[in-house]
Regions:
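Anionic-ligand binding patches
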Residues: 3-6, 13-154
């Protein structure tokens, strides 16, 4: 029998990103939609691993299915700690930014703190898997790239 893992995310693009890879390894990734469950979770952790833990525990406790949850943190080299987006990439000073505001905000960070029109940036992935009441955690850098001071033309 194929192993099943519940992915504690409402983001179907995230599910799609892992689905085929896990299937090839004999693991069927189930989405929240697949099992028709949705829990209102307040992701109020101080960092990505805490947020992933909150999501994983909520869905594992409700279903007792092996559960995987993840959260990403954005880290930008060379900017002050209080300006680090962390888990709030789209939220600045408590306000949710639309796409244009986001581009303007990050472009201005590069103009203020960047060297040669760019800032080194990385995504740090935090993952929690709960199986048979045992918790495993993983944190690693998934992508490294530059933020630049001129938005790309569409």
């Amino acid at each position: 029998k194929m192993k099943e893992i519940l992915f504690a995310t409402g983001n179907t693009a995230k599910v799609d990103r892992f689905y085929e890879k896990l299937l090839k390894n004999g693991i069927l990734l189930k989405s929240l939609k697949d099992i028709n469950i949705n829990i209102d979770i307040e992701e109020n952790g101080k960092n990505a691993i805490e947020n992933a833990m909150i999501k994983a525990k909520a869905y594992y406790d409700a279903t007792k299915i092996t559960t995987m949850a993840m959260d990403d943190t954005m880290y930008i080299d060379g900017i002050p700690e209080e300006k680090q987006p962390g888990v709030f990439v789209r939220r600045v000073n408590g306000k949710r930014l639309n796409d244009k505001e986001m581009i303007d905000y990050y472009t201005n960070l590069v103009k203020t703190y960047g060297k040669d029109g760019k800032l080194n940036t990385k995504w740090i992935l935090s993952m929690v898997i709960i199986k048979d009441d045992k918790i495993s955690t993983y944190t690693g850098i998934t992508n490294e790239y530059y933020l630049v001071d001129k938005p790309a033309k569409k």
